Amino acid sequence: MDRRGIIAYLLILQTLLLSTILHAPWSNPSLYADILGAYWRDFAAAGRIPYLHREPSGEPFEYPYLAAGISLLCSSFGGGLTGFYIAYSLTVMAFGVLLAYCALKFKNGPLTLICLAAPSLIVYGIYGYDVIMAALTALAILLYIGRRYTLSGIVLALSAHVKFYSVIFLPYALIDLKGRDRLRFLAAFAITYLAPVAALPSAFIDLVKFHSSWGIEAAWYIFLFPDAAHPVMRLRDVPPEMMASIRAAQVFGYAIFILLYLHVLGLKTSPEKFMALSLMAYFMGTPRYSPQSNILFLPFLASVMDVRAAPFFILWEAANASVIMTWFASSAPHLPWQPPQIAALIRFIGLAAMFVQAEAMLGAIRIRIPKKVRKGIDVFGRVIGRIVGRL
């Protein structure tokens, strides 16, 4: 193992350890975590089992099958709240090491280290299941690059059973693969994905209903559709007179995603670069941009970055961490011009700038930047390059 590899593993373990401390139930104050709220409080502590029971409000467990399975295993090994939290944190750290391993395989450079030290890993690393999903998705892409298509399809399906986002890779594989390779990949994905769905179909239906009933969450274009802002983001709780504005905002967002995604799909690029760009396309348009979702980018992002992207990465990450940091301190965090929504808008600006920079780096577009602005970016990039280049 080279020096940079050692630093990468130490970085991600350090960030996840800090996240463990921030979200720990014994910390005061303690940041909210979904594993302690959506799972432990609503299910494990009350003797309920995801999919077999519902939380007190009548809602189902909101995460797919593998997320529930990992939670059940951790609570079985851990016993009480403290034991569960320690077991879960150690599990996330193990997947964090896998995430770092895959990220280094995609691009072993100083920018990878910057990604592995992202504030999102500190603020949201132990929040939910995002590190696990990102690590499994990265492993599936790494196996795909190594032409191990059956294993890749299996692991991609497992990642989709933690969170759905990884299915964004399927169209790329359908276009890229031919003949038996395509058949092996799709069969492996379909069998692995559909097996638990066939075993517990009602749970899958509940999951689809739950996530399709969501409104607008931290989407930058709430400034364009202020009438779509509502403190409760579930559509069933929204007054009928607001539905037209919410639907218009959703159509606007998904139209942005589809146009950008089709553009990315048309580029001739490698699987890890495709994942980085397609995730950017999705989160620039999605009506629901949960701040913990930034973790999904981290294994792939360095593959489409150079040092000139460093200012935009810092802006994007700082704004993303600010969303949750300001959310509970705001009297009406869902409204435009409140601190969380301003942070979401700045986050979009940083992400859009990284997307344009990545497209320019890959030769997909040409951009002209004013000389003074370009000089400032280059100076900042050189400073960052000198700092991380020593690592």
Residue ranges and their predicted role:
Residues 1-208, 246-391:
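Multi-pass membrane glycosyltransferase architecture that uses lipid-linked
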Residues 201-248:
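Periplasmic/ER-lumenal interhelical loops and adjacent helix-loop junctions
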